[in-house]
Every structure is written in structure tokens, then in C-alpha cells.
Amino acid sequence: MRSLGVIFLADVVGYSKMMAEDENRALNLIREFQKEIIRPTLDKFNGNMIKSLGDGWLIEFKSASESVDCALEWLKLVKKQGKLELRVGIHLGDVEHEEGPPPDVYGGTVNIAARLESIAENGEVAISNSTYLCLDENQARLFNNCGNQTLKNIATPVEVWSTGRLNLGSKGMKREDEGPLISIKPFAATSELASIFCKDVTDNLEKYLNQKDWIDSTVQKNP
């Protein structure tokens, strides 16, 4: 099922190093963060936890404004505690929902949010223009316009706003020396049944290719 949603992706900076240095401490910090910060703030800002990624979290909101408030509160609280450092990416767009169990979300909106998270500087939030346009004046003034950015595996440039600078050397940025690229372009279907079948094939192929590191892909949703 496809519907409009706000995808929020966050991860812990330097988590692999933390695990290598003291695994028990790293795991305890994550558990503490989930109990003391994530659960209360998701209740407060109406966020729906889709899944925990070990060192990160995939969350869906119905409101762009609430998603940004949640991100800013996370960063404020972890900075105050001084134990973890986060980066967050947020994008508003069409989201493909998989009922499960377990439930999941995927599609271009999830991919863009993931790229935004990866290019955010440590301790910052990067959001798309579609997210920014939904913010109130007080929220909007916290973000700097970083211009159109060409993101890895994303067919068209994305206008990005950030609370700080962007990490333009990130793996989330598209580079000229990248490996093989496959482009998925659908044909116009001749019937409603064929259209549904083609959409399912396209979505499943996109989901599969995005899990592979050795090949890049771009997906054109409409013929």
C-alpha cells in the first residue's frame, strides 16, 4: 500500500569503533538511549518505529513538523548527555508499506532519507525540500539551504536543507568513479492487472538492488 509519509532515519556516529573498544558499554548506551529518549519522544511526537537497525532507527511520521521536532530533541538530549553522537535524515514523499509481519517500508522516499542521513554532518539533521516546506517559521530558520545535491542511486538531484554543513565526501553522494549502474524504466501497461503486476516487479527489484553494494540502481516510477 502506498501513501504519503515522512521517513526519519538516524544512526549513531562511530558505532563500530565503540563496539570494538567496549561492546558491553556500547550496547548498554544504545539500550539506555532507546529507553530514555526514543520511546518518550516517539510518544510525544507521534512517531511510528518501523525497525531498529542495530546502530540506527527507521521511523515514520505523519507530520514533517513533528519529525523535525523529534530529531532536534534527540540531538539536544544526546549532546547534553555527552555519550552518543547522532546524525539524522528526513524526507517527505510517497511511501510503500508492507504489512508484514514484520511491517516494513520501502521505495524512493526511504532511499532519499537514507542518503540524507548519510550526508548529514555528525550531530546534525539533513532534510529534503519537501520536508522543509512543511515547517513553521521557527523551525525553518534553524536550517541552511545546501542547494541541489546529486545523491547515490537517486535519479534526480534533491534540494537539501541542514542544521549544519553537509558531509560531501560521504558514500551517500554520487561520484563519477562509481561501479556499474542499472536503470529500471517501466513500460506503459495495457491493462489494470498488468499495471499492478509491473508495479510489484519494479518495487521488488528496487528493494533487492538497494541491498547490493556492488551495483548502483536508479528507478523511474512512471513510464
Where are these regions (language model features)?
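Generic solvent-exposed, charged/amphipathic alpha-helical segments
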Residues: 35, 39, 75, 132, ...
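Short beta-strand
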Residues: 48-52, 144, 218
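Short beta-strand->alpha-helix linker/helix-N-cap micro-motif
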Residues: 178-223
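A short, flexible beta-alpha/helix-coil linker loop
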Residues: 15, 94-97, 187-192
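Catalytic NTP-binding/metal-coordinating core of nucleotidyl cyclase/transferase enzymes
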Residues: 1-72
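Catalytic beta-strand-to-alpha-helix segment of the class III nucleotidyl cyclase homology domain
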Residues: 58-165
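Intrinsically disordered or compositionally simple regulatory linkers and C-terminal tails
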Residues: 1, 163-182
